Amino acid sequence: MNGMAVVMIIRKYFLIIALLVMPWLAIPSVSAADKGGFNTFTDNVAETWRQPEHYDLYVPAITWHARFAYDKEKTDRYNERPWGVGFGQSRWDDKGNWHGLYMMAFKDSFNKWEPIGGYGWEKTWRPLEDDNFRLGLGFTAGVTARDNWNYIPIPVLLPLASIGYGPATFQMTYIPGSYNNGNVYFAWMRFQF
């Protein structure tokens, strides 16, 4: 697949994600006392869209297929170097937690391009006196598409964890699954500008 085809896939799925997010941006803000869980979520997405503090560069680093959940013949053939790139925007809330909107494309297990985009949130801890060092735990909600599923948009809700210092963060997720399907650790670097 050439570079232009990758750009076309990213544009196509960015439009789908934008159409899913746009209605949330029109939701009026309400006081904290009146918010329910879904309203809090949509307000956080909208605020991250409207008032980003940073722009982010995402660089996929590793995929690892859990060896206990796969036949060796499969893992020997799978790509575990997910070359790609992504961009996003993010902010830190008044509690010090991270919120981000992102779009990334990377080479999947079959060495085919896989776009993903969505919203991520992490509760952040700063266990050292140096506030630049942080740990995070949260989730991402978004949409992806895969070649082996004919690039049909697939919603995802996955856990997030991270360790960071200053503008650099090593962020990761785990895609659960069944035998020979899913059970993949995926990690990337996120650089904040």
Swiss-Prot record:
Pfam families: PagP. This is Lipid A acyltransferase PagP. The keyword Signal applies. Its EC number is 2.3.1.251. It is found in: Cell outer membrane. Belongs to the lipid A palmitoyltransferase family. Residues 1-32 form the signal peptide. It comes from Salmonella paratyphi C (strain RKS4594).
